Regions:
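Short, low-hydrophobicity acidic/polar segments
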Residues: 1-120, 162-163, 180-181, 186-191, ...
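Intrinsically disordered, low-complexity regions
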Residues: 34, 118, 131-134, 204
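Contiguous ligand/interfacial binding patches
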Residues: 123-192
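Disulfide-bonded cysteine-rich modules in secreted/extracellular proteins
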Residues: 202-215
Length: 224
């Protein structure tokens, strides 16, 4: 958390807090000599962000924060993906506050790609899934390839700076390369853009079409 006065002088400089699932509390284990924030009647601007970094010391606005947390080009690891997802909040009401009602927003845009197989379950319900044989996934928003993180649901996601851009994607499936693109679009912060190209429609999914890695599930009526 960062607190400023009306002249943008820093009153509380990049103070770390932790969240336990219920409440925020000062991180007393920080080794930077920082102390908790107290009410100050000179305070007029409050900034909060996540994840914490000591590199944000002396920052006085959201744009400066973004400069410290640029999205990484290779987000294939969980650490790189999370480090790219800057969350921000600010209160510029010009009055001192005794309580901060922080509601974070994503500072950047999110691209999500789910190349899918389409089928019907029990001949009636449409269903799509991302096959496990998808590989070598990348996005292009300019000249350099960007490498996304694979989520638990199989989708490939990458965080990028908001801008006007033409998004392209590329991936391999069954030893063939597939590509697609979205036309020039003004990408907005705190917004997810989802792409769901259908690789093929296999119609009714029956056991004779089962492949390694498929899951077998039953509904509440015990139907497979």
């Amino acid at each position: 958390i960062i607190v400023l006065d009306a002249d943008n002088n820093v009153l509380s400089d990049n103070i770390p807090y932790r969240y336990d699932g219920n409440i925020w509390s000062f991180d007393s284990n920080n080794d930077e000599g920082k102390t908790t924030i107290y009410y100050d009647n000179k305070a007029t601007v409050y900034l909060a962000y996540f994840p914490y970094s000591k590199e944000a010391d002396n920052v006085i606005n959201i744009d400066d924060l973004k400069g410290k947390f640029l999205p990484q080009g290779d987000q294939r690891s969980k650490d790189a993906y999370r480090a790219s997802d800057l969350l921000v909040w600010s209160d510029t009401s010009g009055r001192p506050l005794k309580k901060l009602d922080i509601v974070f927003e994503h500072a950047y845009s999110l691209l999500s790609l789910s190349p899918s197989i389409k089928c019907k379950i029990n001949g009636r319900r449409d269903f799509t899934y991302v096959p496990s044989s998808i590989s070598d996934v990348s996005f292009n928003v300019g000249t350099e390839p960007l490498f996304p993180y694979q989520m638990n649901d199989g989708s490939y996601q990458i965080i990028i700076s908001p801008k006007r851009a033409k998004v392209r994607w590329l991936y391999e499936y069954n030893k063939e390369m597939y590509s697609g693109a979205m036309p020039d679009t003004d990408l907005s912060a705190n917004t997810c853009y989802t792409f769901t190209p259908v690789l093929k429609d296999i119609g009714d999914y029956t056991l004779d079409k089962a492949q390694m890695g498929d899951f077998y599930c039953k509904d509440e009526s015990n139907n497979g």
